[in-house]
Amino acid sequence: MRTHQRYITLTLLCILALQLHAQITLTGVVRLQRTRQPLSGVIVNLKQEGSKRILKFTRTQADGSYKLQTSTPLAGNELQFSLIGYATEILSLSEGQTQYDMMMTEKSIELREVIVKAPSIRQRGDTLAYNVASFADINDKSLADVLKKMPGIEVSESGEIKHNGKPLNKFYIEGRDMLGNRYNLATTNIHQTDVASVEVLQNHQPIKALDDMSFSESPAINIRLKEAAKSRLVGTIKAGGGISPNVWESEATLMRFAKKAQLLNTLKSNNIGTDVTRDNMVLIDDIGSSFLSRNYALKNYINVIPDRLMDISENRVRKNQTHTISMNNLWGVGKNTDLSTQLLYSHDRLVSASCSQTSYFLNDSTILTNENQKAKTRQNKLSASIALNTNTSRLYFTNTLSTDLQWNDTDIDMAGTYPNRQTARQPSYKVHDKFELLRRTGKQAFTFNSYNAYMSNPHTLLVQRPDGTQQQNARSQAFFSNSSTSLGYYLKPFMVSMKLGLVVLSRSMKSTADGIPDSLGLVHNHVGMTYLRTYVSPKAEFKSGGWQVRLALPVSYTPYFFKDKLVQASNNHHKVIVSPSVYLQYQFSSKFKMSLSGSISQNEIREQNFYNGLILSDYRNLNTGFVNYDSEQGKSLSLSFDYKQPLNTLFANVYITRSWSESTLTTSRRFIDDYILNSYFARKTHSNTWMTGARMSKGLNLLRGMISVSTDYMSFNGALVQNDNLSHYQSNLWSITTKVNIHPLKWLEMNYEITYSNESMTFKDIDIRSSSNNLSQRFSCNLNITKAWLLKLSGEHYSNQLSDNTHKQLLLTDFSTSYTFVHGVELSLNVRNLFNQKTYAYTSYTDLMQIRQEYELRPRNILASVFFHF
């Protein structure tokens, strides 16, 4: 009996072994055809060809992968891939093949003649959620590429984001503020296929404890990632090289966004003209205003800067060698507490060549100067910070310790009217700490804030002329502190608060110069300024129905202690400054609101201009200060209207601002031999400014695109003393821009942008008017030849008026092609400045000057590169 049992057991084991041996595992990855992003939740059925009978089934994971085991012979069977909102796909199976990847396409579901699609914008209260997939295209790489296509969102050349004309006050990733004020690091480096939605938090109050107490008119953005991009390492790698001249580009990003920790690290290097240092720019201004400011910056007494271009894309002229590295980390150390660190370094080396003609308009003559310059700049920046933040409904605490170090070197060879060579060394060092504490108990809130900073600018300038050498040294340093405490009460619908503060400044400046003619005046300075400012700032807010009103009446008392250490002379003074302001907003409906604001202010005294000796700012400009405690008086009034229909992808706003100022000091400019002496003249002058503009953006659902129109106008009336004569002038600037992005066909994307501007200056005392008109156009066309093969043709056209009868035309064209393999590797070939255009020219106006400038462009570049997103 036992023998029979053994035989039976052995037979069953053999059958099981054969069965296991015949088991086959089918694997693969399912992606969206348009964006190559992985699809989760796709049902994968194994079935017989021509039959509805399902043999096996499974679902794809978060990364789009699937596994399906079967012992059924593969021949004669097929895999069926299905997901709501996507076209069902079928693959026939072959013996010996176990890897089956699939690309799926989106498909609308028609139910009783109603097409069901995910909306491109959803609204939940004050939050607008933009569905990234509705705006993205296979040609888009970074999140910034997609943001530019979203109605209501504006992205400037620097990367600054505005929503319906208002700048952001916060930028979050999954609800956490890892990057502080440098959100370019996220928008330019996070791949758009990793992002599910962009949430715009309108009227965002970043301090939770003040959520129902103090209103905010500023928006914030929160990035919501796809599940497949969370809690794992994702990133991109790009490398390329080319010729004419030898060019390279390399980039690597690595990031991970988990529930309790986030990291975003980047490494970039190129010489193709792309300014990757913009990633590190501070884009959110949270330093306050007027004498309540939490910041203080030293003046650059030496100011040697190569000519900068207007209008044209910066990457057309940047002849660079740039390297950057950033390391950004955040850890959740408590339920509502985060610890974040940031380390940034950049090296940017630029060379440039330009020529210019400057006309200085005087009451009785015009002075012309010609410059031909070849410049080389080297800029090294190192920034580091560590921040601890707690944000709850009862407690807000943050402390950020930062350091910002810069080493800026400039060398300029100048030919023309005044040939010379300038060598400037302008390092800058700053260490600062920001502490904020808010405690809320019931209907009241207590705060204590403190900002402290030490900074130093030891600058030098060497000017070599045919007739001699000049050297200027200017060293300034300062300690600045602003601490305040406040108590606020919330008595619905009112909130009243009182802030008390103390500002301390201790600053010194020492300068020496050699080689400057004695006839021009004293060329040495050694001064010190100290002040202790106490201030009180009562504020009241009202919010009820559609009304929001804010009234503020800050008052400060400041004793100043100024000493000229060269002559051991003191000039002390005390001053009271009152700066009332009002803000009013009325929400007519969920779509339409009006805002009105006004202020009367006494501007901050320009105490960094308190010196008597001359300082050589550049090869031609000599600056001298003026010890005067009179402050500029100002008034402003601003009115704006906002309109939006988020579900119809329509956003619009209109604004108008009027401002007036009165000063007892007038800027003075004197021409003496080879120099321009810039100073101040004790004479009361008035100036005023008009600013107005409008913006509108509308999504084009049928064409899967957007159209936007914006226009701005500014008019300034002022005066300037030149050679002891007062000159009145008016400058005007008007521009209008239209942008269109459309997909007329599935395989075609088109972008077009046109800008027209008019700039003019009127010299009232001699009745002379000069103006210039400029037109710029940008166009790009993306053609998907196949699902993986892309062609792109783009161009820029500029028509700039150089004089009354002379216009400069410039056409720049680019061509690129790329091919993306199944696993996401992309090979591309780019040709920039296809026709190898040489120069760009334009005319501009400022401070009774007309400047005609011509700049050398980058030559034709041919670059081959490989890109991979993981």
Annotate each PLM feature.
Residues 22-23, 63-67, 87, 94-98, ...:
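Membrane-proximal, glycine/serine-rich, low-complexity loop/turn segments characteristic
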Residues 29-40:
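Structural motif
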Residues 47-53, 75-91:
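A short, solvent-exposed loop/turn motif at the edges and junctions
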Residues 50-65:
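Short, acidic Ser/Thr/Gly-rich low-complexity loop/linker segments typical of extracellular
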Residues 211-212, 276-282, 351-368, 401, ...:
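Outer-membrane beta-barrel translocator domains and adjoining extracellular loop/strand segments
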Residues 330-348, 377-415, 419-564, 587, ...:
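Face-selective signature of the C-terminal outer-membrane beta-barrel domain
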Residues 735-756, 766-870:
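Conserved C-terminal beta-signal and adjacent last beta-strands/turns
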